[in-house]
Amino acid sequence: MLDLKFVQNNLDVVRESLEKRGSKLDVNEFSDLDSRRKSLLQEVESLKAERNSTSGEIAKIKREGGDASEIIARMGEVSGKIKALDEDLKDIEAAEREWLSSVPNMPDESVPFGKTEDDNPVIRHWGEKPEFDFTPREHWDLAVELGGVDFERAAKLTGARFVVLKKWGARLERALTSFMVDVQTMDHGYTEVIPPYIVNRDSLFGTGQLPKFEEDLFKLKNWEYYMIPTAEVPLTNLHRDEVLSEDDLSIAYCAPTPCFRSEAGSYGKDTKGLIRQHQFHKVEMVRFAHPDKSFEDLEKMTGHAEEILKRLGLHYRVITLCTGDMGFGSAKTYDIEVWLPGQDKYREISSCSNCVDFQARRANIKFQPKDSKKKQFVHTLNGSGLAVGRTFVAVVENYQQKDGSIVIPEALRPYMGGLEVITAE
């Protein structure tokens, strides 16, 4: 959430930010509310000043033995007006906060201007695309044929956009998860957390999913609880309403969790395979950074996500999201896209974002500077390290062989009991 006073004093800056993002949010709506708030505030302050000055007059009349009943009656009316105006003022301020809760974060000045994903610049590549002497197959054919993935039974159990993993498929999913967690905790210093997979509304407000994106969430019937769309939600909210020590920053967490998304805006997209599921696993990274070092931490976190792909020998590219393609809470985002030869395209496998103080303000997460009595909001960052299902897809498609088998990347073999090649049973 943006700072209320900043918005009140910089409406033109906010309007420009919304235009860069392609947002249709009407700044004039807030401007009208704020004009009304200022008018009410002036009226209330004027009436309170009148009441205060008149109280001295009443006391004087009483000391002199005079009749102050008319003035007292008039002041009763004034008090009633003040009470009514205070209620109106509360309603206006609530409306301002509601409007503010729907305003996306302001893009950092280093973010390139653009309208769609087509405007996202590629900033680097790693590795080379694998070469095949045959036409590579999509994972949804090959993995099913090898018996590790079952979409039909998943559809019977639940419906579309679900999968059953079994045999080598279940083991590969588990191996990838353990490998990712080990790299992030042992090599990059993250603290592993297993959080609840169900959270309350306050948590989702803190990270920005509510109130604007409720349709993307799975809500529990008769409960004000939701299934997590990403572990970013519980990890960030671990420190909601807390004041952290400056010496503790940066704090880094990672969590392997299932994620649950309705994919409300994805009708007709990626209807085959594992790319877009209602339930999927992801290893999430979250950092709480000092404001002076958060963009340095963003580069570091992005490198931590890239390291997984490097160790797996998977070709990828990194792009910077333009202003029109950024997530709601982000000030700057890098997407990592892995090459999928079966689909002959790059697909997002990680998104690493610096939200600066946007989430911290919503969730009231501060730190105490050593050289100041005034507490400051921390900066929060989040990123996938990585999306497990999409990494599963990348391994299957990049390491497939002409005979229909799949070679296990060397880094994963210790997690697969030494298995080197997946073949049909």
UniProtKB/Swiss-Prot annotation:
It is found in: Cytoplasm. It catalyses: tRNA(Ser) + L-serine + ATP = L-seryl-tRNA(Ser) + AMP + diphosphate + H(+); tRNA(Sec) + L-serine + ATP = L-seryl-tRNA(Sec) + AMP + diphosphate + H(+). The keyword Transmembrane helix does not apply. One of its GO terms (cellular component) is cytoplasm. Pathway: Aminoacyl-tRNA biosynthesis; selenocysteinyl-tRNA(Sec) biosynthesis; L-seryl-tRNA(Sec) from L-serine and tRNA(Sec): step 1/1. Its EC number is 6.1.1.11. L-serine binds at T230, A231, E232, E284, S384. GO terms for molecular function: ATP binding; serine-tRNA ligase activity. GO terms for biological process: selenocysteine biosynthetic process; seryl-tRNA aminoacylation. InterPro entries: aa-tRNA-synt_IIb, aa-tRNA-synth_II, aa-tRNA-synth_II/BPL/LPL, Ser-tRNA-ligase_type_1, Ser-tRNA-synth_1_N, SerRS_1_N_sf, SerRS_core, tRNA-bd_arm. Keywords: Aminoacyl-tRNA synthetase, ATP-binding, Cytoplasm, Ligase, Nucleotide-binding, Protein biosynthesis. Homodimer. The tRNA molecule binds across the dimer. Catalyzes the attachment of serine to tRNA(Ser). Is also able to aminoacylate tRNA(Sec) with serine, to form the misacylated tRNA L-seryl-tRNA(Sec), which will be further converted into selenocysteinyl-tRNA(Sec). Belongs to the class-II aminoacyl-tRNA synthetase family. Type-1 seryl-tRNA synthetase subfamily. This is Serine--tRNA ligase.
